Regions:
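Sec-dependent signal peptide recognition
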Residues: 2-9
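A conserved hydrophobic secondary-structure block that centers on an alpha-helix together
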Residues: 255-269
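Short, conserved charged micro-motifs
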Residues: 188-190, 286-290, 344, 400-404, ...
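A common structural junction motif
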Residues: 197-204, 296-304, 410-421, 646-655, ...
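Proteolytic maturation boundary segments
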Residues: 20-58, 285-325, 330-331, 365-366, ...
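M16 family metallopeptidases and their MPP-like homologs
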Residues: 59, 64-77, 82, 86-88, ...
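Hydrophobic h-region of N-terminal signal peptides that target proteins for export
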Residues: 10-19
């Protein structure tokens, strides 16, 4: 076995050594444009710098006619003024509000009031007396209402929806602010016109309602113990750097006193072409597209951008643990300050993390998680430009203190520093990163973000490309020296304990009034975009007979095949048409595959071998299906298949391991009482299905404790005796793949009948109902549910149109009303969900996360949208155009083809239903959609489920929305 590993490592090192000559920076030119590239770059990326300093980075990928776009600014929260933190994040929000050419029906008239609003804010920020501040804010609200008569909300969202963009969003972090879209390739001209105008002269309109959304975002962070720990850790690690001195969302006192003039000043200083980049990954012609970028963004003028001066951080004299209090589960976090991405030894920082924890065979994986020493432990590396942070986290199991968890984690740091790990782990980490990169660079989104990182962190892309090679060549002694040098007293310890947080200060809701949306108004700029003539993309749908090859491995065991023509990676899945609804013990049984070994190998040795092969196997028990997945490079395919198959057929369950696992499950269930998301899910299940639902019918604590090793072993050993399908996606042909799988994947002659999934029927309420569960939090989480109709494939186009128009995105009437007009939430959406199989029912679902003091307004507003769907022919036609544009340019690729086929079969669809959506969407009329809303949503009694604090919410007053029932945690979990 050792000889096999050494041979494999030698071959990989030889191939990588030859590749080490690659990644050299080169220059070339085409059609008058000079660009740089790197030899051997799998993304074939090119980097151009235009005359005005604008960077353009391009990577062509013709797998599908779409382009992933990023417009990046090398300015984030690090660049915020110390007395005005949060500006970068504010500005990111305002870049969706338009310019003097769109987002307005009459900018000259609007500007008069916008100037008044800006002056009022400047005055507001100077006044300290609360009564005076309320008077001024009332004036801001009043003038904003007048200004809003001339604004047109969401025109940016309407335009990108119109061109078929998906994933429209933006984010702000320490070093960057980035604006993203995934667009059809035939809409590149329209997208460039939209974006060049967007950045030309942004107008800070509809500010006070957007400010409310930022307040909501801040209050959400106050309910999130992870966020609080993260902020405290960075503040402790960085006493001189803005990483620790300020946060991206900003300080509460600064958020309460926003300055529009300071935001504009930030824009003028940082949003300049020599500080920005356009990154494109997808289907386009580089030279043609570059000429268009130059034409559209040539107006931008280069300006000097001052670099921040860095003050070195000091090594700590002593480590003083910090305590953070909150309602959620207890955990300990340890953070180490390391050199940043620009360091020539960044690859060693990555290696430190991978040797510590890689989810398979790291020190934490083998010494802690596999032995179940704590409830859960992990490590990750947060890569930043100036300093990385290596973060370790641990959750205690029953009877364990946070200090004990800390000691267990620190023991792994000591093992790293003193070289108590297998040297193979280093080369295997490099091999695994190489394989992961190969997979990532085949995807346009992952490629775009990799190229984005190289720009904003100011490192050559070749540096990231070379990291797997550098890692594999690293000697153990060098990594140990690096660990001893870096893992000294430069760390922080945060104990997150349960208790009432008396430090965090919630931002109180200011008194504001809804602003008009002017949905049916349209600016000339937007009309021109929508009227643009384009060359249509020809849609491409899956042919279930031609695109998927089918064969039999045995009786009632079909293999589904689609080839990987992109690289040498494979994915193998065993899919069973039953899940935890059929057998509540399945998730526990399959978990043992990760924790126990066989008569030949221990679990730790199995994990090491999988990692050495750069293969991962995952087990997943969903509600109605079960999956066993194996993936990795084709060169190690046979060995990986043989190991996995032997493990399943010969698993030896250790009694102590089973007992520890059961105790951990019991602890996780206890922790759910302090997890608002778990509470929300459980309450939603209760509201949807009643007292007997997927949460309350889980295996009970008593049954858990009665589980025996024999039960688990038999369940796993017999798994392949049940009917299942084998899904193969990889570089081999069907005959080759099948013959190798058959060699190891032997199926018993005596077959078992597959267990039947339990059916949970939704409740059709005869009257409106409200369920409430108490949890101490600043926010309130509100869900709406109602039972839908049985599955009908003929309604698929209609449901697509309804969701796109009603509540699926930022251009929807639901989002516009709840967030843009009334500023009631940061996150909100609504949609009609189709069932997962042909015999179950659909479901209408809506969600609003809001401040507790806005709960009444939120419920009233959503109920109004449920009773009456707002009418806008403009938005309706826009929604239909978006759907057809996406359907034409969307491509289902790789193993997703096989899973889409199985999903279609469960719904009794014999062909790719996207064909109907593409062809029939434009035939749908507004009255048809209105009738769907009336019959499937308005006509149904809604059940509202609320998670919030009874100290902040008057539960007695909720009866105006329906019959109120307060449910305890015991009732909704029922363990």
């Amino acid at each position: 076995m050792r000889m096999k590993f050494l041979t494999l490592t030698f071959l990989i090192l030889c191939s990588l050594s030859s590749n080490a000559q690659f990644f050299k920076e080169k220059k070339d030119s085409s059609k008058g444009y000079v660009y740089t590239y790197f030899e051997g770059d799998p993304t074939k990326s090119r980097k151009y710098i235009l005359k005005n300093g604008l960077t353009v980075i391009m990577s062509v990928n013709i797998d599908k006619p779409r382009i992933y776009t990023c417009i990046a600014v090398k300015a984030g929260s690090n660049n915020d003024p110390k007395n005005n933190t949060g500006l970068a994040h504010y500005l990111e929000h305002m870049l969706f509000k338009g310019t003097d050419r769109f987002g307005t029906s009459d900018f000259a008239k609007e500007k008069v009031y916008l100037d008044q609003i800006e002056a009022l804010y400047e005055n507001y920020n100077k006044v300290k007396d609360e009564k005076q501040r309320k008077v001024i804010y009332a004036q801001i609200d009043s003038v904003s209402a007048i200004a809003a008569k001339y604004s047109i909300a969401n025109e940016y969202d309407k335009m990108v929806q119109n061109i078929g963009a998906q994933g429209t969003n933006a984010f702000t972090s320490f070093e960057e602010t980035v604006y993203i879209n995934d667009i059809p390739a035939n809409q590149i001209d329209a997208w460039l016109e939209i974006e060049s105008e967007r950045f030309r002269n942004p107008i800070l309109r509809l500010f006070h309602t957007e400010l409310e959304a930022v307040y909501e975002e801040k209050n959400i962070s106050l309910d999130n113990d992870d966020e609080k720990v993260y902020e405290m850790m960075y503040a402790d690690l960085f006493k001189n750097h803005n990483y620790g001195l300020q946060t991206t969302i900003g300080k509460t006192e600064h958020l309460k006193n926003p300055s529009l003039s300071k935001i504009r000043e930030y824009y003028t200083k940082n949003y300049v072409p020599n500080n920005m980049a356009i990154i494109l990954s997808g289907y386009f012609d580089p030279e043609e597209t570059l000429a268009k970028i130059e034409k559209n963004f040539g107006y931008m003028v280069k300006k000097e951008v001052k670099k921040r001066k860095l003050v070195p951080e000091k090594i700590k004299d002593k480590i003083v643990p910090i305590e953070v209090l909150g309602e959620e589960t207890e955990f300990v976090t340890i953070g180490y300050r390391l050199p940043g991405m620009q360091s020539p030894e960044n690859y060693k920082s990555i290696l430190l993390k991978e040797v510590l924890e890689n989810s398979v065979a790291g020190l934490i994986d083998l010494n802690i998680n596999k032995k179940l020493l704590v409830l859960e432990a992990s490590a990750y590396l947060e890569e930043n430009k100036d300093n990385n942070v290596l973060i370790l986290r641990g959750y205690p199991k029953q009877g364990q203190t946070l200090e004990q968890v800390k000691d267990i984690l620190m023991a792994q740091i000591d093992s790293l520093k003193f070289g108590k790990f297998d040297e193979k782990l280093i080369s295997s980490a490099g091999f695994n990163l190489k394989v992961n990169n190969e997979k990532s660079y085949a995807d346009i989104t992952s490629t775009a973000f990799s190229l984005l990182n190289s720009f904003t962190k100011e490192i050559p892309f070749s540096k990231k490309l070379a990291e797997p090679i550098q890692m594999m060549k690293t000697k153990k002694i060098d990594l140990v020296i690096y660990a001893k040098m870096q893992l000294k007293n430069n760390y922080s310890i945060i104990y997150k304990r349960q208790g009432k947080d008396t430090v965090s200060v919630k931002i109180i809701k200011p008194e504001i009034h809804p602003v008009p949306l002017n949905r049916d108004k349209i600016s000339r700029f937007v009309k021109n975009i929508m009227d643009n003539e384009i060359t249509e993309v020809k849609p491409q749908f899956i042919d279930f007979e031609k695109d998927i090859l089918k064969d039999s491995i045995a009786s009632n065991c079909q293999i589904l095949y689609t080839p990987n023509k992109k690289n040498n990676l494979f994915t193998l899945n065993y899919v069973f048409e039953f899940g935890r609804y059929a057998d509540q013990k399945l998730p526990i049984a399959l978990e043992m595959l990760k924790l126990c070994g066989t008569d030949k190998q221990s679990s730790s040795n199995l994990s090491k071998e999988f990692y050495n092969l750069a293969c991962t196997f995952n087990v997943s028990v969903a509600d109605e299906q079960m999956y066993i997945q194996l993936n990795g490079p084709d060169s190690t395919f046979e060995r990986a298949v043989s190991i996995l198959d032997y493990l399943i057929k010969n698993l030896k369950v250790d009694e102590d391991v089973l007992e520890d696992l059961i105790n951990n499950i019991l602890q996780e269930r206890e922790n759910n009482n302090f997890d608002k998301n778990a509470i929300r899910r459980a309450l939603n299940n209760y509201a949807k299905f009643g007292a007997e639902n997927p949460t309350t019918t889980q295996i009970s604590n008593k049954e858990l404790k009665r589980l025996k090793t024999k039960d688990i072993e038999e369940k796993i050993h017999d798994i392949f005796s049940y009917n299942h399908k084998v899904l193969y996606f990889g570089p081999r042909d069907l005959i080759s793949a099948k013959s190798l799988i058959v060699k190891y994947h032997t199926i018993p002659k005596n077959r078992n009948e597959s267990p039947t999934n339990r059916v949970f029927n939704q409740i059709q309420y005869t009257e409106p109902q409200v369920y409430f569960t108490d949890f101490n939090m600043v926010q309130a989480e509100i869900n709406w549910n109602s039972q839908g109709a049985n599955y009908d494939s003929r309604k698929a186009p209609l449901i697509e149109v309804f969701n796109e128009y009603y509540g699926a995105g930022m251009a929807s009437v639901f989002f516009q009303t709840i967030r843009e007009s009334k500023a009631l939430a940061y996150s909100t959406y609504a949609d009609y969900k189709n069932p997962t199989n042909s015999t179950s029912q659909g479901n209408f679902f809506a969600y609003v996360g809001t401040q507790a003091d806005k709960l009444d307004s939120a419920i009233v507003s959503v109920n109004a949208l449920i009773r009456e769907i707002p009418i806008s022919e403009t938005l309706f036609e826009n929604a239909k155009k978006s759907i057809t544009s996406v359907a034409a340019s969307e491509r289902i690729l790789n193993d997703k083809i096989l899973f889409y086929y199985l999903k279609s079969k469960r719904l009794n669809n014999t062909y790719d239903l996207r064909k109907d959506i593409f062809e029939k969407t434009n035939q749908i009329s507004f009255p048809e959609m209105q009738a769907f809303h009336t019959n499937e949503i308005k006509a149904k009694n809604q059940v509202i489920s609320i998670v919030g604090s009874k100290d902040r919410i008057d539960v007695g007053k909720l009866n105006k929305y329906g019959k109120v029932q307060v449910l305890t945690l015991k009732e909704i979990f029922n363990y």
